[in-house]
Amino acid sequence: FPYTTLFRSSIGLVFFARKMLDNVMDGRYADVMERALYNGIISGMQLDGKRFFYVNPLETEPGVSGKLYGYKHVLPERPGWYTCACCPPNVVRLLMSLGKYLWSETEEGVYSHIPAGTEAHFDKMDVTVESNYPWDGRVTYHITGKTEKETILGIHIPSWVRPGSVQVRINGKEKNITADVEKGYLILKRVWENDEVELVFPMKIRKIYANLKVREDAGCVAFMRGPIVYCFEGVDNPGLLQSYHIFEDAKMEEEVCKEGLLEGCVLLKIKARKLETVGDSLYSDIAPVRTLTTLTAVPYYTWGNRGENQMRVWMRGE
């Protein structure tokens, strides 16, 4: 059932993807790591770090989630602790060793899998990454010192980036990278000496559609920006979340949250249509009233931090 996957599965997926990168430098595995790290893993922790839960539901419903048979494990809020708490220390282990998931070193050079701000020291070269990723797509790699010979700096180009849309500058000079991308990695090979590589990934809002074989998500749409998956919560969108329908050509805008618990996060504002039932009858031949409104979507990893309420990743489309 796709709506109640386990948190620890995301951690295992990252472990597996990283091992696969040791076998073959293929950007598909870096994509898997990135998506799991920014969504399926950090969503398990409350933003203040004091609470935790095991499942990554794509939908929660007060009165059902955590209560009804079959949904008791799908908690709508993170509990303080578990009788069997295997995953909290697993998260700590992963985060404290994050460097080896962000980078790889081979005989030919070094490879950046996820462009998070870091200082990385290798036998061949030292690299400092300056970025506000995943909110901002501008990433700068500073190479310190001089390499003894031609050395590869491989930079993962995420699969969510449209081909040809990445801007690359080396020491301020623009570079066409079309011929330099191999299996999802930009391969830059040269003798490095205090150089600077700047990339700009376009961080556009993207609609995501499920294969129609996924029955629960047929006719629905989800949203991503960069590697971040978004969700909708009742605290931001009054009424029943299932009453909202999003247009195929809906206007979508970004807004940086400037205060409160989500300060610094990029929120999405999406035009939608809201349906409201006329009367109290369970069934009626009177069509629902339709009104135009604007929905707010928040990063999925932040859900469940503002009280118990409805949450959905997949919204009805039109």
Name each model-derived stretch:
Residues 3-6:
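Short, small-residue-biased leader/transition segments that mark boundaries at the very start
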